[in-house]
Design a protein with these regions (language model features):
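Sec/Tat signal peptide C-region and signal peptidase I cleavage site
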Residues: 25-31
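Mid-chain, structured segments of secreted extracytoplasmic proteins
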Residues: 79-126
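Bacterial N-terminal signal peptides that target proteins for export
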Residues: 4-14
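Acidic, Ala/Val/Gly-enriched low-complexity intrinsically disordered segments
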Residues: 2-5, 26
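Non-cytosolic coordination micro-motifs
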Residues: 32-85, 118-223
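Bacterial N-terminal signal peptides
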Residues: 13-23
Length: 223
């Protein structure tokens, strides 16, 4: 199939088919994942990404980045979110998974605590100018297939669900402490000069407190 010759109004159907078609792997059917509470599965522990764990200071996160990827502090992009008043430390990493291409990793430090509260890993646009859609979808499936091997809380457990136009929640699960791992695939409609299926983005998030994020918020009664 020539992907770039596809009808531009049907790209999301193509990706849904790709994702659903890969639900069966290693002879195990995952089309009905259940509620994520299988007795034979080990509980997932969502405590960060590789050596970077929730609660770490900025100094410790930078050291974890050095240990994991050999990236020094001079190569880390530090940015302040003017809305949420959080700090992010961004890096680019090649081949987090085999043949997955370039990913951008953001380590987010809380507004009040100044400690690690979230990690985002992004593949596709805008990290890569012309991402390969098949590679992005394959990466999504590899990660999903990895995550579903563990046990999660029934509440909020989701696999392969379309949540909006061009948006698929590939996986979402909470560990026993309510910390969440979320994998989102977005494939916006044709925009401007961007070719069909070249706007695709895969975002993997690890969040410590999804219901009570450490970000700046105007308090009730202040205005």
């Amino acid at each position: 199939m020539d992907m770039l010759a596809m009808n531009p109004i049907k790209p999301i159907i193509f990706f849904l088919c790709l994702i659903i078609s890969s639900l069966f792997f290693d002879g195990t059917g995952l089309a009905r994942p259940g509620n994520g509470t299988g007795a034979s599965q080990k509980w997932a522990v969502v405590n960060g990404f590789r050596s970077a764990h929730f609660g770490m200071t900025e100094f410790n996160v930078k050291q974890a980045i050095k240990d994991d990827f050999g990236i020094g502090k001079q190569e880390i992009l530090r940015n302040v979110n003017t809305n949420q008043k959080t700090v992010s430390l961004g890096i680019k990493v090649e081949k987090l998974l085999p043949d997955s291409g370039t990913a951008q990793v953001f380590y987010i430090l809380g507004y009040k605590s100044k400690r690690l509260i979230e990690i985002k890993v992004i593949w596709g646009r805008p990290v890569t100018e012309n991402p390969d859609p098949e590679v992005i979808v394959a990466t999504a499936n590899q990660l999903k297939n990895h995550f579903v091997q563990k046990k999660y809380k029934k509440e909020g457990f989701i696999v392969n669900t379309q949540v909006g136009e061009g948006v698929i929640l590939v996986f979402q699960g909470k560990d026993r402490k309510g910390r969440i791992v979320r994998l989102m695939l977005t494939n916006p409609k044709f925009e401007g000069d961007v070719k069909v299926n070249k706007n695709i983005t895969l975002t993997l998030s690890y969040v410590e407190k999804p219901l009570d994020p450490d970000i700046f918020q105007i308090k009730e009664g202040e205005f």
